[in-house]
Amino acid sequence: MTDLSAFWPQCLARFEAELSAQQFNTWIKPLVCVAGEDAIALYAANRFSLGFVKERFLSRIETFAEDILGRPVTIELRIGGAQAGASAPAAASPRSPGRPAPAPVAATPTTGSLADSIVSDVPLPNVKLTAPKPAIGGGHESTRLNPAFTFESLVTGKGNQLARAAALQIADNPGDSTYNPFFVYGGVGLGKTHLIQAIGNHVYQKNPQAKIRYIHAERYVADIMRAYQHKAFDEFKRYYHSLDLLLIDDIQFFAGKNRTMEEFFYAFNALLEGGKQVIMTCDSYPKQIEGMDERLISRFSWGLTVEIQPPELEMRVAILMKKAEADNLKLGNDVAFFIAQNVRSNVRELEGALKRVVAYSRFSNQPISLDLVKEALKDILAAGNRQISVDNIQKTVADYYKIKLSDMHSKKRSRDIARPRQVAMALAKELTSMSLPNIGDAFGGRDHTTVLHACKTIAEMRESDPDISRDYAALQQMLRN
């Protein structure tokens, strides 16, 4: 059983692993800890800090204390620095004659070391132990989830409907081997983070006691490095191996980092063996991640892998209307349709375009109209018109499939030529404003019905053929960026 005086350094290590550096340094690190025989006092610098710690972190501190010490312990929050911490308990519980009162030492703000914070063994009054009271929002704070990312606020369309359906199943039944791990991939700004955090928020809502952690892959790497530097790696492993739900964003950042991949391999195995849920996002299909450990790539495919594709026109309009509604904006259908037609790449850029329009409207003191939108987004519209042309599409597709550019205009009908040509026609219909006859002319003088047939064929194949679906999405991303 751990002595009370050893509690605070271990508690600090756990908080540093859980919280952002700003949260840790602002609220937890400045606390002064005084350990007694049956209780622990934590001193905050002022009433505001005390109130915030009590509301957000007290229940977590109590949980850590019981976990570290092996028994429930009363945690008292008080106002005052080291001097108050040394004197207050003494007044309530006299010491033996001649025994000096050791002064508590606060965490040294200059070094940042986990071992910098120590506690004193000043006796505290024997206080009747009471069950810890849950702090409002304290548990959710430690998850690092954005409470705004919910299933209700997620717009659904063809591009993400499969991923959303799977996410709902996982949110209701985390740990189900059918969906474990859950691997979501797709281009930037398509809502992968929103989707997986919606799972986390749903699970937390159903079970606030669940140990949930959302973390970006780069932060996970930094946490590993810090754990090594502070010789707190056992604590790091114990924390991550004990989670009920782990959500890691942009896991492609692990590639080439051998130590990180090794440690994640063990954490991954520990969680799945314990029936816990692992959820990851990535910018590419697992087998296409260069520099990733083959053992991890194999394990990524154990559960369910789904792709999120760029939103189609109807979904883009719905996203804009929902965003406008959330911000109490009046947005006409014609305006939403125009923005959605011209900003096709991803959700992030779509919302960014709307913010620009709103800002332009406010600065110019004009209502949002089609003319105002065209003026506000003129550089985006010009860039889009410059970048996406049939010539550009043909060259990009030819390079991607490693065929000659001339094959786009030829009469060759072999599958390895015809299929890329059909893909290029479908992309031309989606990404340009050209008519079907004009697209046909650009592909060697073909009839508009040939273009229509190509578009229909590719649309059907994207539903049934994962390879075509991946190729098409990759080409969309290349052309839009």
Curated annotation (Swiss-Prot):
- Which amino acid positions bind ATP, per UniProt? G189, G191, K192, T193
UniProt keywords (A-Z) are: ATP-binding, Cytoplasm, DNA replication, DNA-binding, Lipid-binding, Nucleotide-binding
Residue ranges under compositional bias (Low complexity)? 86-96
| Chain spans, region Domain IV, binds dsDNA | 362-481
Q: Where is this region: Domain I, interacts with DnaA modulators?
A: 1-71
Q: Which GO terms describe its biological process?
A: DNA replication initiation; regulation of DNA replication
Protein location: Cytoplasm
- Cytoplasm recorded as keyword: yes
Residue ranges of region Disordered? 86-110
Similarity comment: Belongs to the DnaA family.
**PANTHER family (alphabetical):** CHROMOSOMAL REPLICATION INITIATOR PROTEIN DNAA (PTHR30050:SF2)
Q: How does it assemble?
A: Oligomerizes as a right-handed, spiral filament on DNA at oriC.
Q: Which HAMAP family match?
A: DnaA_bact (MF_00377)
What name does UniProt use for this protein? Chromosomal replication initiator protein DnaA
Please name the source species. Laribacter hongkongensis (strain HLHK9)
Q: What is the lineage of its organism?
A: Bacteria, Pseudomonadati, Pseudomonadota, Betaproteobacteria, Neisseriales
